[in-house]
Design a protein with these regions (language model features):
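Conserved active-site alpha-helix within GNAT-family acetyltransferase domains
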Residues: 95-108, 205, 228-246
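Conserved beta-strand-loop-alpha-helix junction that forms the acyl-donor binding cleft
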Residues: 91-97, 223-234, 250-259
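Conserved acetyl-CoA-binding loop-helix of GNAT-fold acetyltransferases
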Residues: 72-82, 194, 200-217, 234-239
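Short amphipathic alpha-helix that is part of the acyltransferase structural core
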Residues: 1-26, 114, 118-150
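Acyl-donor-binding surface of acyltransferase catalytic domains
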Residues: 50-51, 58-126, 251
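Conserved donor-binding loop and adjoining core beta-sheet/short helix segment
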Residues: 2-5, 16, 22-82, 175-186, ...
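Short hydrophobic beta-strand segments in globular cytosolic domains
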Residues: 52, 172, 244-245
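Flexible, substrate/cofactor-facing loop regions flanked by secondary structure
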Residues: 122-187, 191
Length: 259
């Protein structure tokens, strides 16, 4: 079958392909939202008119974010001829890293676990949490900046769902969302963090539980990511009812001068 490359602009066509592995492709599906779609370049490999591989380059952040999906052998021409990013953060399946390394030198490689929640398996964890809003943005930024390495942007608070725990007027724990897409029925939990002095008290569980409960009330599919080596966090999520869907790889890549 003859392989060809094309640029994708039709959301319906893109979504149809991403839906073949919806829970792996949740971030890419979220990028179909109008505010994010304008930052995206989509390219695909096709055989006999059927999409077999996809490369998304999201240019709304620096450096670019690249998502790969589909047959590894059909990703090669996309990485070689369609993707122009000199450097980027990549997300791909473990079996796709070999073809990626042909074109990019990878560092900061980490295996992540995509965890998903069956609503019937959800086990709520109650605690002294409250909903966070715009007035809490500076507290959130301070908590993340001073004590953690958490990527947070204020728009996530405006558009998402965040809960927190306070002690003596200070925000000491929080959980929120990376992305909420009601159009595509997705809620991606993230930005979970507890002040070092307040760990071991179950605050991560109660904050995450509150976020999940609100997302489920909106009939959204709920997912999150956790590092494969972060067993402690994975146990927290498992107790809430999450289970591992698939491993994937995150890495920073710099394009090789010659391939």
């Amino acid at each position: 079958m003859v392989l060809s490359i094309k640029r994708l602009e039709d959301k319906a066509e893109i979504y149809a392909f991403l839906s073949e592995d919806r829970l792996y492709a949740v971030y890419a599906i979220g990028d179909l939202e109008p505010a994010l779609f304008r930052h995206c370049d989509w390219h695909a490999s096709t055989r006999n008119g059927r999409l077999t591989a996809l490369c998304l380059c999201f240019k709304g952040l620096v450096p670019d974010r690249v998502f790969l999906m589909g047959a590894s052998e059909d990703l090669a021409p996309l990485l070689d001829g369609s993707l122009e990013a000199p450097r980027a953060y990549f997300a791909c399946l473990p079996e796709q890293t070999s073809v990626l390394r042909r074109f990019y030198s990878l560092t900061r490689t980490e295996v992540m676990l995509r965890m998903v929640l069956d609503p019937q398996e959800f086990v709520p964890c109650d605690g002294p949490v409250h909903r966070l809003g715009a007035r809490h943005v500076h507290q959130l930024q301070d908590l993340y900046r001073r004590y953690g390495d958490v990527a947070f942007a204020p728009y996530q608070l405006d558009q998402g769902v965040f809960y927190g725990v306070e002690q003596d007027g200070e925000l000491v724990a929080t959980a929120g969302t990376h992305l909420v897409s009601r159009a595509y029925s997705l809620g991606i939990v993230g930005n979970v963090f507890t002040h070092p002095d307040y760990r071991g008290l179950g605050y991560a569980s109660v904050c995450t539980s509150a976020v999940v409960e609100e997302l489920l009330a909106q009939s959204l599919d709920v997912v999150l990511n956790v590092g494969q080596t972060n067993g402690r966090a994975a146990k927290v999520y498992e107790r809430l009812g999450f289970h591992v869907y698939c491993p994937f790889v995150e890495a920073f890549g710099v394009r090789r001068e010659s391939v």
